[in-house]
Amino acid sequence: TIFHVAAAMGGAPADIFLNTVVTTKNLCEAIARTAPSRGNKPPLFVLVSSFGVYGVADLPRGTVVDEGTPLENKPARRDPYSQGKLRQEKLCWEYHDKGIIRLAVARPGVIYGPRGGAFSARVGLNLFGVFLHLGGRNTLPLTYVDNCAEAIALLGDRPEAAGQVYNVVDDDLVDADDYLRRYKQRVTPLRSVSLPYPVTMLMSHAVERYHRASKGQLPAVFTPYKTKTTWKGNRFSNEKLKAIGWRPIVTTEQGLERTFEHLKARAS
């Protein structure tokens, strides 16, 4: 079994493409070259993908995101990371279809835990020294790092996972309001401003107009499409992963407690 967890998390678009897509192609080509020595049995190839591959911008608010949710069909409107993960996953399916690998895809939501970051963009963004709280009551697709690792390992141990996709999110998920409130209580009284979704959409339209008028000099931090993708609000299912035997080994309450403990120690 091969576990492919590497990808560029940030940087220039060219760097993300190189370190996510090109490296994956090189790996798959190396597997193809070893095929004669393995006989006819292709290896089980577990790819760690991302919720970023889903195209949720045009779905109604509150739609359940599961493995049947359509993939993004307007990748140019998304961030470079999501574009890279989408291309990476499609590339792996091409090698699966050629019989070079037997692909099983894990699509984690927001992986969190000690030594990770404090906030996903789904909660909000830190701009000009103020945290803009944009997530409101939206459910966060959290998966604690230990639970995510268990899911990935499980796929590598399940031959029936080949040709399948599995969302990785935990049980008893909290919303962005709850997460931010707990952070302020447990870590630091962060200065924040809450923006309702309609206000964020108005800002997004304004930023997009100024971005075009400035011929790209003003970064398009917000666009209406990105805003709908990130902050409109969805629900999330882990039923398919549970059907093959996965269960969270760390509850969300425990995971948040451990994470905030570490963040507090790091801040001090």
Task: Give a label for each model feature.
Residues 96-147, 154, 183:
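NAD(P)-dependent short-chain dehydrogenase/reductase
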